[in-house]
């Protein structure tokens, strides 16, 4: 997928395996395996993902189980259920979201702290 394109995995679709790509991806269905994207991944409220995820940015409205490594940002919205460890420089968890795991934010602190 070329940069700038968005792929959609619809509500009735189940994918088992590895997903890789350079564009954005929206998951409304179910994915099991591993996901590696160069851009933005969105898991919609109907989406269920059981996978380790690597992406630039991740927005979760549905369910995700597995470790997450984002180079930019992870947003866990109020309707989301997430189980797994997160590594990202910025993480947002909205009130109402369910999260079970650990968060590692690789942020450089000033020397005087």
Swiss-Prot record:
Report the record's disulfide bonds. Answer: none
> Superkingdom, according to UniProt?
Bacteria
Write down a Pfam family by its short name: Bactofilin
Task: Kindly indicate whether the keyword Cytoplasm belongs to this entry.
Answer: yes
Where does the UniProt annotation locate this protein? Cytoplasm, Cytoskeleton
Q: Which keywords accompany this UniProt record?
A: Chromosome partition, Cytoplasm, Cytoskeleton
Q: What InterPro entries does the record tag this protein with? A: BacA/B
Record Gene3D superfamilies: 2.160.20.120
Q: What happens when the gene is disrupted?
A: BacP has nearly wild-type localization, only minor changes in ParA or ParB-parS location, no changes for PadC. In a triple bacpN-bacO-bacP deletion ParA, ParB-parS and PadC are mislocalized, nucleoids are more compact, DNA origin regions are mislocalized, DNA content increases. The triple bacNOP deletion is synthetically lethal with smc or double scpAB deletions.
Q: Which GO terms describe its biological process?
A: chromosome segregation
GO terms for cellular component: cytoplasm; cytoskeleton
Assembly and oligomerization: Interacts with BacO and BacP, the 3 proteins colocalize as an extended structure.
Function as written in the Swiss-Prot or TrEMBL entry: A non-essential component of the chromosome segregation machinery. Positions the ParA-ParB-parS chromosome segregation machinery within the cell; BacP seems to be the most important bactofilin in this process. Forms a heteropolymeric, subpolar scaffold in the cell; BacP probably forms the core, BacO contributes to position and integrity while BacN does not seem to contribute to assembly.
Q: Which family does it belong to?
A: Belongs to the bactofilin family.
Name of this chain's protein: Bactofilin BacN
Q: What taxonomic ancestry is recorded?
A: Bacteria, Pseudomonadati, Myxococcota, Myxococcia, Myxococcales
Name of the coding gene: bacN
